[in-house]
């Protein structure tokens, strides 16, 4: 989502899927691999740089992880703050925060869920754009080389380069993304899947619009991955400005059409896609129907879509947040009805994601 606001391979899902186990990490499946059907568990990106754990920010609790695993989610997108993980550019990662990250990853792994690492920084470090004099591309590459080494070639961990690059020229962002990817493949020696956003908050609706220079759909076609293991990440909301900050679904049809258009772009260029954020208010039938329509686009086109992660849930999200699907004392949130058909699809076809195999 914009700065204005703020699966898990569960046992039943893995039946018939051969997994080679190594310690607490499960390796790539030797049989079919399901698409990502996940949830954003938000909290570690809260507050300002620094801050005190469990006062200013938090990592997902066991209770929250277990709940979403029990519902059939098989992936967690895990937002965190770059500045906390690396307080000084070009310097080692903070040992304490790395420890908290590792604990969160193991908590999620214990439920056989996959993890998407998400530096939730909008292409900034301490307010300065990546690719600027104060945050050069080399610093972004250094950060990713250090982070990728922690989970190099552990294929249940996916590297999301950056959350929603915003107000940054597309040429500047493309250079930074290419350098970070080169560092992941080179310095870290990691072959993990990389998720690559565009600029302009990586909206599917604006993928072909020239907002910060060339359209994402033109410039990002020049993205370079020496490992050739990446997918383009887009976000899409349903409200009047597609920000996900309004309590309406007035652009539902346009949002679904945007995903369909992005699907055509993926197929035309031979690329893969990932829907990293999408969500809807739970109190309106139209919104729930539109939410299902968005999921259906990805589920019906698994040759190019690697999956999705819903926004949002997390231990500290208020019950009044319209998009929040953290359970309340009354039980499950209404939005789960739109996600359930995909989460409960245990058929052979449902467990097979051609774009990941």
Model-identified regions with their sequence ranges:
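Bacterial N-terminal signal peptides that target proteins for export
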Residues: 2-13
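C-terminal functional modules
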Residues: 330-357
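Hydrophobic beta-strand scaffold residues
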Residues: 115-117, 273, 308
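Active-site mouth of glycoside hydrolases
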Residues: 32-210, 215-217
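N-terminal signal peptide c-region/cleavage motif recognized by signal peptidases
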Residues: 22-24
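Boundary of Sec targeting at the N-terminus
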Residues: 28-30
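Histidine-bearing beta->alpha loop at or near hydrolase active sites
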Residues: 163-164, 308, 314-316
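Extracellular glycoside hydrolase catalytic/binding regions
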Residues: 57-58, 142, 149, 153-158, ...
């Amino acid at each position: 989502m914009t700065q204005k606001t703020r699966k898990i391979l569960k046992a039943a899902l893995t039946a018939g899927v051969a997994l080679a186990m190594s310690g607490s990490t499960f390796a790539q499946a030797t049989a079919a691999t399901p698409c990502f059907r996940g949830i954003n568990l938000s909290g570690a990106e809260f507050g300002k740089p620094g801050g005190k754990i469990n006062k200013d920010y938090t990592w997902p609790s066991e209770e929250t992880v277990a709940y979403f695993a029990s519902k059939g989610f098989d992936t967690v997108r895990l937002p965190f703050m770059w500045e906390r993980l690396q307080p000084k550019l070009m310097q080692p990662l903070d040992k304490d925060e790395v420890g908290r990250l590792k604990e969160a990853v193991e908590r999620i792994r214990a439920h056989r869920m996959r993890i998407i690492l998400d530096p939730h920084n909008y292409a900034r470090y301490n307010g300065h754009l990546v690719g600027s004099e104060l945050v050069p591309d080399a610093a972004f590459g250094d950060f990713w080389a250090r982070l990728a080494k922690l989970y190099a070639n552990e294929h249940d961990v996916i590297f999301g380069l950056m959350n929603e690059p915003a107000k940054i020229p597309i040429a500047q962002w493309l250079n930074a993304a290419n350098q970070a990817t080169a560092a992941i493949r080179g310095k870290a020696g990691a072959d993990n899947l990389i998720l690559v956003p565009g600029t302009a908050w990586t909206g599917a609706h604006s993928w072909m619009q020239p907002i910060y220079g060339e359209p994402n759909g033109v410039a990002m076609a020049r993205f370079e991955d020496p490992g050739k293991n990446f997918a383009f990440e887009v976000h899409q909301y349903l409200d009047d400005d597609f920000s996900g900050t309004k309590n309406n679904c007035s652009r539902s049809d346009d949002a679904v059409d945007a995903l369909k258009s992005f699907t055509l772009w993926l197929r035309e260029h031979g690329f893969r896609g990932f829907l990293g954020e999408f969500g809807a208010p739970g109190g309106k039938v139209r919104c729930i129907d539109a939410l299902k329509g968005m999921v259906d686009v990805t589920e019906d086109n698994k040759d190019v879509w690697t999956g999705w992660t819903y926004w949002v849930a997390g231990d500290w999200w208020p019950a009044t947040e319209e998009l929040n699907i953290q359970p309340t004392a009354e039980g499950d949130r209404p939005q789960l009805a739109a996600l359930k058909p995909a989460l409960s699809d245990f058929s052979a076809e449902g467990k097979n994601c051609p774009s990941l195999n």
